[in-house]
């Protein structure tokens, strides 16, 4: 089933969780999350950290348990799988890029044909490396901004 984890994947998540849970109490608090994110170059305010925790903290205790962490990981995985399916639907020739022609055909297939200028603008907006087509990373970045 989409979003489900294998025992090996769950073990990897447990290892990652334990690395962030520096006091070993079985939960991740705002201080631990902040330190882990800071190590990756992301500095979040206390309010941002609390908001991030609240999005995962289903029991409302202000901390993330391993079960809450796993639930969030499964949701993220399912979202990623949906994104990959959407990209493949647009990348009709399977070469890893969406061209203007593929976008035109896909939009027409969805019953939403668009004028050439709008198609060109959509590709230009998403095309970070300016090669005239959109790769998966550019596609994901574009959707994350919406």
Swiss-Prot record:
It comes from Homo sapiens (Human). The keyword Calcium applies. Pfam families: EF-hand_7 (PF13499). Keywords: Acetylation, Calcium, Metal-binding, Repeat. Ca(2+) 4 binds at residues 127, 129, 131, 133, 138. Associates with transglutaminase 3. Particularly abundant in the epidermis where its expression is directly related to keratinocyte differentiation. Very low expression in lung. Binds calcium. May be involved in terminal differentiation of keratinocytes. This is Calmodulin-like protein 5. Residues 8-43, 44-74, 78-113, 114-146 form the EF-hand domain. GO terms for molecular function: calcium ion binding; enzyme regulator activity. Ca(2+) 2 binds at residues 57, 59, 61, 63, 68. It comes from the Eukaryota. SUPFAM superfamilies: EF-hand (SSF47473). GO terms for cellular component: cytoplasm; extracellular region; ficolin-1-rich granule lumen. The modification N-acetylalanine is found at residue 2. One of its GO terms (biological process) is epidermis development. Ca(2+) 1 binds at residues 21, 23, 25, 27, 32. Ca(2+) 3 binds at residues 91, 93, 95, 97, 102.
């Amino acid at each position: 089933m989409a979003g489900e984890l294998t025992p090996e994947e769950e073990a990897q998540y447990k290892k990652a969780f334990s690395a962030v849970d520096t006091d070993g109490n079985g939960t991740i608090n705002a201080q631990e999350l902040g330190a882990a994110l800071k190590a990756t170059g992301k500095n979040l305010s206390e309010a941002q950290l609390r908001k991030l925790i609240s999005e995962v903290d289903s029991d409302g205790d202000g901390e993330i348990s391993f079960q809450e962490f796993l639930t969030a990981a499964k949701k993220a995985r399912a979202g990623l799988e949906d994104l990959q399916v959407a990209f493949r639907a647009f990348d009709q020739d399977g070469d890893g890029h969406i061209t203007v022609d593929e976008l035109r055909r896909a939009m027409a297939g969805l019953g939403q044909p668009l004028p050439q200028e709008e198609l060109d603008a959509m590709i230009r907006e998403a095309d970070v490396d300016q090669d005239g087509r959109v790769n998966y990373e550019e596609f994901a970045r574009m959707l994350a901004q919406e």
